[in-house]
Structure formats: C-alpha cells, structure tokens
Amino acid sequence: MEKELIFGHRNPDTDAIGTAIAYSYFQNQHGYNTEAVALGEANDETSFALKKFGFEAPRVVKTVANEVKAIMLVDHNEPQQSVEDRDQVKVTHVIDHHRISNFATIDPLFYRAEPVGCTSTVLWEMFKEQNMEIPANIAGIMLSAIISDTLLLKSPTTTDIDKEAVEELAKIAGVDYKEYGLELLKAGTNIAAKSVEELIDLDAKSFELGSKTARIAQVNVVDVPEALERKDAFLAAMEKDAKANGYDLFMLVITNVLDSDSEVLFIGDDESKSVFAKAFGKELVDSEAHLLGVVSRKKQIVPPLTRAFEA
C-alpha cells in the first residue's frame, strides 16, 4: 500500500500533533502505510507532552505532493489552514471537530467530525468502536490533546464524551489527569522568552468571515498583565503581519488558563471594529477588549464573528 501522510493544521497545537501520531498508529493497525508529520515545529506545551510519553516530534513538512499522492487530515479541514499544495494530492480521510468550510474533494472520502472538545476525543471513540486496545503512550498523547484543547475540561467546548475520554485515557496512561493537566498547561504559558512576532504566529489560524479575511491568534498565559506590558509591540507586529499577508483584521486572544477569561488585541478598519462590538457586545478601547469567560476560538470567537460579518 502506498504511503500517506497524516497531519494537523499549520502552527500545530497539541491536538494537531498528538492526534496525528495517534491516528497514524490507528490506521497502521488497519493495514495502512502512514506517517504522522507536522506543518510546523511543536510548541512548548506539545514538546512537554511528547517528552512525557516518549515520542519524538514529528518531522516538519512544507509540501506533500513531492512525497505522496494521498493524505489524511486531523484537526482541520479548511484549505487556508492546511499544507500549501493540498490541491495537488488526494484527501482520503478527515477527522475533525471544527466547522466545515471551503472544503471539497473530487472523490468520496472518509470524513468524521463531531462537536466535541478535541479531535482525539473522536479518535478515542473510534478505538472503542473497533474494540482496539490503546497503548499507554498513545493514550497519554491523546489525553494531552484533550486537556490542551479543553483547558483541562474547563472550556465551553467540553462535552461529557471528552470527560469520559479523559478519565479512561488517564487510567491507561497511568497519570492523574488533574495534576498532569496543570503541568501541561503551565508548560505552554511561558511567553517571556519569545518575541511578539513568534507569539502572534504560535497558534494562529486564518478564517474567511463574510467578505473579510481574518487572522486570529491565541496565547495561553497565567499572568495577563505581564503579557500586556508588550501591548504596543504586539499591535505593531500584528499590523505589519496583516499588511504583509493581506488580512483585513488581526486578533490576538490572550487567555488566562487559570481564570478562563481573555483579553483581546485587535487590528482592523472601523467597519471591522464595529462588527467586533456587535459580535461581543463590547467596544474596543485603545484596540483592546476584555471578554469575560471567553476561552475558545472555535466556539466563542469565530461563530459570533462569522454571524456578525455575514449579517
């Protein structure tokens, strides 16, 4: 069987990398020939999880058509979030937990998406449906993905299925998920050593919102005031990046993983700022707004913005 590559979105997080690794194991057990790769370097949080459970970071690829004819996607489906030459290969499988947008294929494919907190939760269900045993290290990296995406089950994206998956995977992996979860999340909140340019690209995704092209970046912290000491530098970097890449608006969501609130920095024209205010019922003051209880880009930021821009 010809080799296929499995990968998550650009600027990969723990779900994108962890689920790619776990899904590659799953598919190889079913006779496929796959390799988990990544569309970017593993961040600090993901590196912590990989080391904890004995994995090397997947190799990073920029293109895939030079290697394979077919690919499998996890944790994304939108082309602007995927590998740049995706249109030159066949997508055979997708496992996701996001909206479906700008996605089309010539041939039928396996596609499974569910409104749960993490793609690894969907994969956990697939393991159970197949009565497949999950190795301890695979359980650990899947557990890490769910903890990361749901902010230790505190995100509004969290479902009962996510909670059940976390409890079972933690037992298999042999860890206390609450204790390990805090260690994992804190590993990803050390932003002091990174430049503003790195931070606005670390976990950033592009979206089509009505007629606007938006870039929405997110960083997790435990000290928001410390992060905002670099506010002017953040805004300048966002402005520069937006102009260079043709984004109509750029949002940086600074999320406090302990309090489950976010501070937003915003670059955009007056129309976009007005739509932001309409979407969240909150005016931007000096390009900044506090969003109480908002932690999820997927569920709490992109949907209201999409509705507001398309109204």
Swiss-Prot record:
Keywords attached to this entry: Cytoplasm, Hydrolase, Manganese, Metal-binding
Gene Ontology MF, one: inorganic diphosphate phosphatase activity
Subcellular locations according to the entry: Cytoplasm
Enzymatic reactions: diphosphate + H2O = 2 phosphate + H(+)
Keyword DNA damage appears in the UniProt entry: no
Names of the cofactor(s): Mn(2+)
Record's GO cellular component terms: cytoplasm
One Pfam family cited in the UniProt record for this chain: DHH
Record's cofactor remark: Binds 2 manganese ions per subunit.
Binding site for Mn(2+) 2: D15, D75, H97, D149
Keyword Manganese applies: yes
Top-level EC class as recorded in UniProt: hydrolase
Residues given in the record as Mn(2+) 1 binding sites: H9, D13, D75
EC identifiers of the protein: 3.6.1.1
Stated family: Belongs to the PPase class C family.
Protein name: Probable manganese-dependent inorganic pyrophosphatase
Organism of this sequence: Lactobacillus delbrueckii subsp. bulgaricus (strain ATCC BAA-365 / Lb-18)
Gene it is expressed from: ppaC
